[in-house]
Amino acid sequence: MRVWSLLSLFALLCLPPSSTAQARWVTISNENGQRIEVDTADVGITGSGHITLWWRLSYRVPHSIPSSVSPTTMVRWSSMTEHEEINCHEDETRIIQQTSYNAAGDAVDVIKLDSLSSFDTPTPDSVVELVMQWACKHL
């Protein structure tokens, strides 16, 4: 957990403010070399305080991503074909794993996180914290 915290802190220090629409991908790595890239700019929030957060797995998932697909070919959630919802948090956070396809027709996994946590305004800190909670359980 300490490694995750240090890496995410370093990434946040290098980030410009997330108020613009341009994607700001924060990379979080664990001891096994697996990485999650979090888009801190693409965070939506409704009047009810429901946060929608996007991130993408930048390592290969053998059962769903062909070995020929490089992490650099990862794409945003564009064409939705199948999904899996994982209820894993007491704070009603839902993880949705979506398989999408890049321009070459290769399947890639993109992750969406919906949280009913009590954040008034999403910040890079809260975004990374939510992803770290999920990553520590599932990576």
Language-model segments: what does each one mean?
Residues S19-L139:
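N-terminal secretory-pathway/extracellular module detecting exported/lumenal segments
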Residues M1-W4:
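Positively charged n-region of N-terminal signal peptides that target proteins for export
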